[in-house]
């Protein structure tokens, strides 16, 4: 089989086009159309949003292709879909279906507890989660074209996403301040490719976009993550588990775009009704913490 590989430049360029926007989880065509009308730059097609996956337990797998196709046929914006960590065949199936992006996602039950996908061998671009700079650079080294914080999906609690974006950015500042002769040791400490540390040193930032994800539940949450340096926002359960999904979707898009307009965010938040019910992170058992999946 002859495989045509997409270049890093093209793949990363597609992600750059989403910068500053909101990507919303949807489970059917109706939700996808709501997301598109609200101004989402892309949608993530799943069978269940993260809060439902968390509640159901068991093994969470790639969405039924019928659902993914339904969403793809319903909207004109890019459609993403999730594959299990290390599940080569799920990723190949999604690629064959023509999705615009694949999320190698810790929200689903990992298929491989030792190896992530070698994403550079695919034509379709990938997004992956990270909690720190080491994880970020390992995923980029495998071929990820876009990153997102892991946060703690399905909780409606922003604290872990805040922790992750702050840690990545602090570690980037540390690398930028280093002398070149210190970078190899830092690469060893981070278990990350040396060449990527050189890129960060030169660019002053990651070579790919890094979105916020995992716990965004309100317009203020979305604005906070942008304030902390995120390039955009993924919203999983926060929209369609709220009292008024259409209003929430539009408000989160506006808050992401105008994240320093605090008067606007206040007005947007007035008539939204109840957000999704949240979970205190400390109440989660170790095996319930999705962010611990992958390495």
Curated annotation (Swiss-Prot):
The reply on keyword ATP-binding is no
Annotated active site: 82
Catalytically driven reaction(s): aldehydo-D-ribose 5-phosphate + D-glyceraldehyde 3-phosphate + L-glutamine = pyridoxal 5'-phosphate + L-glutamate + phosphate + 3 H2O + H(+)
Please indicate if the UniProt record lists ATP-binding as a keyword.
Answer: no
Question: Tell me, what is one Gene Ontology molecular-function annotation carried by this entry?
Answer: pyridoxal 5'-phosphate synthase (glutamine hydrolysing) activity
Extract the SUPFAM superfamilies matched here: Ribulose-phoshate binding barrel (SSF51366)
A Pfam family cross-referenced in the UniProt record is: SOR_SNZ
- Tell me the Gene Ontology biological-process terms attached to this UniProt entry: amino acid metabolic process; pyridoxal phosphate biosynthetic process; pyridoxine biosynthetic process
Q: What is its EC number?
A: 4.3.3.6
EC category: lyase
User: What positions does the entry give for D-ribose 5-phosphate binding?
Assistant: 25, 154, 215, 236-237
Task: Give the keywords, sorted.
Answer: Lyase, Pyridoxal phosphate, Schiff base
CDD domains this protein is in? pdxS
Q: Which InterPro entries would you find in this protein's record? A: Aldolase_TIM, PdxS/SNZ, PdxS/SNZ_N, RibuloseP-bd_barrel
Question: NCBIfam families attached here?
Answer: PRK04180.1 (NF003215), pyridoxal 5'-phosphate synthase lyase subunit PdxS (TIGR00343)
Q: Know the name of this protein?
A: Pyridoxal 5'-phosphate synthase subunit PdxS
């Amino acid at each position: 089989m002859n495989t045509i590989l997409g270049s890093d430049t093209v793949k990363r360029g597609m992600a750059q086009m989403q910068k500053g926007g909101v990507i919303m989880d949807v489970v059917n065509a109706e939700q996808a159309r709501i997301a598109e009308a609200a101004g989402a730059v892309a949608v993530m097609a799943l069978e269940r949003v993260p809060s439902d996956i968390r509640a159901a337990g068991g093994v969470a797998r790639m969405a039924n292709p019928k659902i993914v196709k339904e969403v793809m046929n319903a909207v004109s914006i890019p459609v993403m879909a999730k594959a299990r960590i290390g599940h080569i065949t799920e990723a190949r199936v999604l690629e064959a279906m023509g999705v615009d992006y694949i999320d190698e996602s810790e929200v689903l039950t990992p298929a491989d507890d030792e190896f992530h996908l070698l994403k550079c061998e695919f034509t379709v671009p990938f997004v992956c989660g990270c909690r720190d700079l080491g994880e970020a650079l390992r995923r980029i080294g495998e071929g990820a074209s876009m990153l997102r914080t892991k946060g703690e999906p399905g909780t409606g609690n922003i604290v872990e996403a805040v922790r992750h974006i702050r840690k990545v950015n602090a570690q980037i500042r540390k690398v930028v301040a280093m002398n070149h002769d210190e970078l190899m040791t830092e690469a060893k400490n981070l278990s990350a490719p040396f060449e990527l540390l050189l890129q960060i040193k030169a660019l002053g930032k990651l070579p790919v976009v890094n979105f916020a994800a995992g716990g965004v539940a309100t317009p203020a949450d979305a604005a906070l993550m942008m304030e902390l340096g995120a390039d955009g926002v993924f919203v999983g359960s926060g929209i369609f588990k709220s009292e008024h999904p259409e209003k929430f979707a539009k408000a989160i898009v506006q808050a992401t775009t105008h994240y320093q307009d605090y008067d606007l965010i206040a007005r947007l938040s007035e008539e939204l009704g109840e957000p999704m019910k949240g979970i205190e992170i400390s109440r989660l058992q170790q095996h319930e913490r999705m962010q611990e999946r992958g390495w």
